[in-house]
């Protein structure tokens, strides 16, 4: 990815990200630098979220082709190798990390598919713009751009632009009777092979473009709420540079393990997980919000699945970070491994403390960032850091 100091200033404001500003530009706070590195790592899984947002911005005239390429008359004339185009896509891809975007996901997580369709229809009628996300049973997701909804008396047809199939109009069909949606992705002619899939409640959601307004509160700052209206929260972010791997978080709460890479997992109250949206049904990471008023203590381990088989992996390199209210940002780089009951990558206690311990058979590199302070420490196999 191409997220840098300039991007971060536009996303969160100079005061939140720049430790100082020199003749050469913004010198990032350590936490901002760590966050940007992790976000760029996650983009190896694709940039569909950024393309879906940019498509909506161009469609609604919130962005102009002339800002991307003065010579371009249509979006088809834009080059994927143009740095301005790449930077814009990466910039808007990053907004899925915003707490307001995550909170929109949380709200729509409780909607039935027909309720999502109705909300979208009403929003479009009132001039609101959205991106739409769909999720697979394998724990990954894809972002597309909706622009119309039609109800034929039996089903809703949501017309979308899918950046995987440029130049065509695709449709998501929602059946209110069964509360199921289906998407024959790529079907441009009847009977043609497709990459279609389907789902029910909690597998389709909307993000209002208003939730992506910039600048916003940074998730890595020392502010009291880090941009959340939910109050006392911890943000967990897990990413991987391995394009063949899907990574998430295994949370242990009151002795029970919840695997966020398994869409069938029913998460407890106070836990909200969203896969990062990449290319197709892919993406290299997950974002998890923990409401610490409901879940005061927990343990977190990185978990990885092979993208082609969905089998768990015990050798996948990953990066996981935790941002909690009023405490330093902690980032660990290690690899997945077998769990042991007395060891967790992150062990967050009721007092706001975090203990870091790599999985058995692995080492870890730990970074702690707080304001101007930045501390790095290697943790050997069998060791811990707090």
Task: Indicate where each model-derived feature is located.
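Short, solvent-exposed linear motifs at loop/edge-of-secondary-structure regions
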Residues: 36-61, 143, 147-150, 243-259
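Active-site signature of cysteine proteases
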Residues: 137-210
């Amino acid at each position: 990815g191409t997220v840098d100091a300039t991007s971060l200033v536009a996303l969160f404001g100079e005061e939140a990200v720049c430790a100082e500003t020199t003749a050469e530009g913004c010198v990032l706070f350590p936490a901002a630098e760590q966050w940007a590195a992790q976000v760029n790592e996650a983009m190896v899984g694709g940039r569909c979220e950024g393309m879906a947002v940019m498509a909506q911005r161009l469609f609604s005239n919130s962005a102009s082709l002339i800002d991307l390429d003065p010579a371009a008359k249509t979006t088809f004339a834009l080059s994927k190798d143009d740095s301005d185009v790449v930077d814009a896509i990466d910039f808007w891809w990053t907004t899925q990390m915003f707490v307001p975007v995550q909170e929109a996901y949380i709200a729509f997580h409780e909607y039935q598919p027909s309720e999502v369709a109705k909300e979208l229809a009403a929003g479009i009628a009132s001039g609101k713009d959205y991106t739409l996300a769909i999720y697979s049973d394998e724990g990954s997701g894809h972002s597309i751009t909706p622009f119309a909804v039609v109800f034929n008396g039996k089903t809703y047809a949501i017309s979308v632009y899918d950046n995987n199939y440029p130049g065509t109009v695709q449709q998501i069909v929602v059946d209110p009777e069964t509360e199921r949606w289906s998407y024959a992705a790529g079907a441009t002619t009847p009977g043609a092979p497709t990459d279609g899939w389907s789902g029910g409640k909690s597998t389709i959601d909307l993000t209002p473009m208003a939730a992506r307004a910039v600048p916003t509160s940074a998730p890595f700052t020392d502010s009291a709420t880090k941009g959340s209206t939910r109050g006392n929260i911890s943000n967990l972010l897990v990413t991987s540079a391995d394009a063949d791997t899907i990574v998430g978080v295994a949370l242990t709460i009151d002795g029970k393990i919840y695997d966020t890479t398994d869409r069938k997992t029913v998460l407890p109250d106070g836990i909200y997980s969203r896969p990062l949206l990449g290319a197709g049904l892919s993406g290299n990471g997950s974002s998890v919000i923990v409401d610490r008023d409901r879940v005061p203590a927990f343990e977190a381990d990185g978990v990885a699945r092979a993208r082609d088989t969905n089998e768990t992996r015990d050798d996948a390199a990953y990066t996981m970070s935790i941002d909690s209210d009023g405490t330093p940002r902690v980032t660990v780089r290690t690899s997945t491994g077998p769990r042991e009951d007395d060891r967790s990558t992150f062990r967050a206690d009721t007092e706001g403390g975090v203990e870091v311990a790599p999985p058995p058979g692995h080492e870890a590199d730990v970074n702690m960032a707080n304001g101007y302070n930045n501390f790095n420490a290697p943790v050997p196999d069998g060791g811990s850091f707090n």
